[in-house]
Amino acid sequence: MLIKVCGLTRQADVDLAASFGASMCGFIFHPVSPRCVSPVQAASLESGSMLRVGVFVEQDAEEICRIMAEARLDMAQLHGRQDAACARAVGAQRVIRVIWPARYCHRALLYNELQNHADACACYLLDAGLAGGGSGVRLDWEDLNHLPSPRPWLLAGGLSAENVGLALSRCSPDGVDFNSGVEDAPGQKNAQKLAAALAVAAKQKGNRYLS
């Protein structure tokens, strides 16, 4: 099971994520986000063996690559209108493509969208709402049950210790993404909430892993 903790801004929280078994740590590079960090700030946060993920909303491929190098990132989570060409310019195996299932009125349309990006990403992140992230809004998990995804996918959207077990029983993601559900305030993780959430997630077995 891939476990990602996103919206990190403090070394203490990065250390907590690593100690509780997270495999990925996320840094947000969107100026309007209360969890936004600069490339210099992200670079200063030591993350051990966790994969370092940058969240990008408005940047183009050139800017994404520049920030990735400066912030020592392994992967780019494309959270905006970046198209497949942008993803390929960044490097498909370095891309997490965000998809919002609520935009699609039928599972077939969602599946088509997944297929459209299959050769331009390493995995998907399925988030709640119609855009953005970190809102705490949950997905309808049962709608994602037996989703025929061509790539591994992570579930996001208001996950916490209280609901992640139920979420994983309703659908079968290859990973989970925690953010607002393990915080006291935006960018400030709560050690108890984080430990409890990751303990539940760590008991689950994902189907696939990033190559």
Swiss-Prot record:
EC number assigned by the record: 5.3.1.24
Associated pathway: Amino-acid biosynthesis; L-tryptophan biosynthesis; L-tryptophan from chorismate: step 3/5
Biological process, per Gene Ontology: L-tryptophan biosynthetic process
UniProt cross-references to CDD domains, sorted A to Z: PRAI
Enzyme class: isomerase
Protein name: N-(5'-phosphoribosyl)anthranilate isomerase
The keyword Isomerase belongs to this UniProt entry's keyword annotation: yes
Reactions the enzyme catalyzes: N-(5-phospho-beta-D-ribosyl)anthranilate = 1-(2-carboxyphenylamino)-1-deoxy-D-ribulose 5-phosphate
Family: Belongs to the TrpF family.
One GO MF term attached to the UniProt entry: phosphoribosylanthranilate isomerase activity
Pfam families xref list: PRAI
HAMAP family on file: PRAI
InterPro entries: Aldolase_TIM (IPR013785), PRAI_dom (IPR001240), RibuloseP-bd_barrel (IPR011060), TrpF_fam (IPR044643)
Cysteine pairs bridged by disulfides in the record: none
Coiled coil stretches, renumbered: none
Keyword terms of this UniProt record: Amino-acid biosynthesis, Aromatic amino acid biosynthesis, Isomerase, Tryptophan biosynthesis
